[in-house]
Amino acid sequence: MSIVLFLIVFILLSLIVSRYLYSVALNVPSKIDVVFNPIEKLIYRLIGTNLEHMSGKTYIKHFLLFNGLMGGLSFVLLLIQQWLFLNPNHNLNQSVSLAFNTMASFLTNTNLQHYAGETGLSYLTQMCVITFLMFTSAASGYAVCIAMLRRLTGMTDVIGNFYQDITRFIVRVLIPFALIISLFLISQGTPQTLKGNLVIETLSGVKQTIAYGPMASLESIKHLGTNGGGFLGANSSTPFENPTYWSNYAEALSMMLIPGSLVFLFGRMLKTKQQIHPHAIMIFVAMFVMFIGFLVTCLYFEFAGNPELHHLGIAGGNMEGKETRFGIGLSALFTTITTAFTTGTVNNMHDSLTPLGGMVPMVLMMLNAVFGGEGVGLMNMLIYVMLTVFICSLMIGKTPSYLGMKIEGKEMKLIALSFLVHPLLILVFSALAFIVPGASDALTNPQFHGVSQVLYEFTSSSANNGSGFEGLGDNTVFWNISTGIVMLLARYIPIVLQILIVSSLVNKKTYQQHTQDVPINNLFFSSVLIIFIILLSGLTFLPDLMLGPIGEQLLLHV
């Protein structure tokens, strides 16, 4: 019942926040302008932007330049952190390969971690690299999504100003929301301090080091921005990052909030601030139905437990790798949310999930469109929508058209490329891990689970998720460089292609009613969309899943 109430709250909050995002995205005057306008104007003066509207190419150019500059500065700081201030625990510099991986990870909103935060970063880099990139990567994803939505709902090549979009989103959404969440987490027991690690003497007389630091400020944006990287190595399974039952719900809800709201925002942009277009509701229904299906699957297999233990007379579900304070139910819920919304934070160890329970987060990342991350999740879903409309139109002999825009050969080539980037990166680099000498030494499990570890690592990297089957010994040159390359390519190539797609479509947009268009405003469309998503991704990844989690599940029942 608590999960049902939680999901109802998610839907209601998404509806409410989407109204606020409408004002932020479309520069609608509001009463709070008196607070935020002076801050924004100061930022515009500092960065030297004149707020001129940009064309699609200019928007993407500044998006890439901005991200490149942030990545370069972050890379340098990670290489010299031990010589800088705010390093009370005297943590050392990161190696070149690890610094590259960390930079690529947080720059792309992935937050894959091949280090433990307790020993791998200073407080300065935790705040000025990690937390900073958590804000800017989330805002960058939001900005390009809004640019795409403006194209789909408008009739002009002008899509706004990149710097204005990210500034308004950070100042008006991320910082205020993150501040509220941080204060709540502090009230629940999450530390926020610049003091060094605490050394205590236990009852047995042994000295123990307790790592803490500026955690609450990182935790809030970690979830709100669908980032996922933890201050500590064990992430949100630790009692500092996730102290209570209520903090667990707050963290889960905060990572769902903005991706869910963006779907309704799309509907409002298609219609009005007060009304949501039925097409956006049908997209939300498709996403939500798939989410519920995967959640139920994960719950079922985790509560079913391990048959090998049942043969020994040990009843019960799979509690391995889980916090007793959360149990199986909340752990499965968190697992499904963190991979559906491509956050990557964990409150249990995914490597300890049952084979098919662990396949749920893997498949969600392979789909990469069941809500997805900040902005890019909706962009990926819209590619599936266009594919569905195109195929359905051809099947019934109608001209492929989406929102009054004809989908022709040029657009379909770009749509196909955008769709293929994700599976190609996963499959090619997973194969390389078994071919390159020494790469497979990182595997800690033989047979099927070893394949699952490799597949999960590259799927998480390509989906910009960041969670992992952490039995993999991944802090090596091969794994640092390969996953870093995957994260960068999987982030930027699809975004560029998707903006090119809508830039091409917008030139064909008309407000005339087209009776020959495929209906996209009913539950039948949602059903067909779900079927196409499952079929397209299933045909792509099923052979690899057979060699991984499905094979492992069959092995348990031999």
From Swiss-Prot:
Signal peptide coordinates: none
Database matches in InterPro entries: KdpA (IPR004623)
Source taxon at top rank: Bacteria
Keywords tagged on the record: Cell membrane, Ion transport, Membrane, Potassium, Potassium transport, Transmembrane, Transmembrane helix, Transport
A GO CC annotation given for this chain: plasma membrane
Topology within the bilayer: Multi-pass membrane protein
One Pfam family, short name: KdpA
Cysteines joined through disulfide linkages: none
Compartments where found: Cell membrane
Segments traversing the membrane: 1-21, 60-80, 129-149, 169-189, 246-266, 281-301, 326-346, 353-373, 376-396, 415-435, 485-505, 523-543
GO molecular function: P-type potassium transmembrane transporter activity; potassium ion binding
PANTHER family documented for this protein: POTASSIUM-TRANSPORTING ATPASE A CHAIN, POTASSIUM-TRANSPORTING ATPASE POTASSIUM-BINDING SUBUNIT
Family recorded in the similarity comment: Belongs to the KdpA family.
Subunit structure: The system is composed of three essential subunits: KdpA, KdpB and KdpC.
Function: Part of the high-affinity ATP-driven potassium transport (or Kdp) system, which catalyzes the hydrolysis of ATP coupled with the electrogenic transport of potassium into the cytoplasm. This subunit binds the extracellular potassium ions and delivers the ions to the membrane domain of KdpB through an intramembrane tunnel.
Record protein name field: Potassium-transporting ATPase potassium-binding subunit
Organism of derivation: Staphylococcus haemolyticus (strain JCSC1435)
